[in-house]
Amino acid sequence: MEKQKILDQIKGGLIVSCQALEHEPLYTKEGGIMPLMAKAAAQSGAVGIRANTVRDITQIKEVVALPVIGIIKKDYEGTPMYITVTMKEVDALVACGVDIVAVQGTGARRPDGSSAPEFIRAVKEKYPQQLVMADCATLEEGIACAEAGLILWVLRCVATHRRQKDATISIMHLSMNFPKNALQRSLQRDISITRNRQKKRWKREHSLW
């Protein structure tokens, strides 16, 4: 699918995350459940799917014609990063034909010492035609990733580690206490890229751009 067609299709719509990790009830070794979740989302009007692992992405793309945002979650020693952390994960996602590669765009360093913007530049250099999305938690992170060449970002409550209950104060404040409209508006003023939000909705209007 062409890049502009993907962007036009997901603009202003609902992207549904269809993921299950090994310790979660909907996970099975053979897969097959996430594609059903994706089909249900598509039938209900979703404009895109976010999925984890090459297996689930491949199975989902076989049953729905929606753009798929792909990630690979993996813990690495010495870094709190866990969402598409290295080029190895990016290579696997691109090889399976994912429409958008999502990487963690928060402030921690990757195992090789690179920052999120540095990693994004490396990805864009290796795969110049690939759409890449960054998971950001602060205004500064969003701007830095945009300056690295992104045209997509997702505002998430990204903890510093998926097993860590306490993230930074600012992230927990965003996650637990109020809708993230103010941060989103700040990003919209400072950078001109496509925006996406994930999780925490108090009212319908909180999901509107």
What do the PLM-derived regions correspond to, one by one?
Residues Q19-L21, Q43, I72-E77, C96-R110, ...:
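Glycine-rich phosphate-binding active-site loops on the catalytic face of alpha/beta enzymes
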Residues M1-T28, K61:
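N-terminal amphipathic alpha-helix/helix-capping segment at the start of soluble metabolic enzymes
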Residues Q43, V63, A95, E125, ...:
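Residues at the C-terminal ends
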Residues G78-C96, A137-I151, Q184, Q188, ...:
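Catalytic cores of alpha/beta
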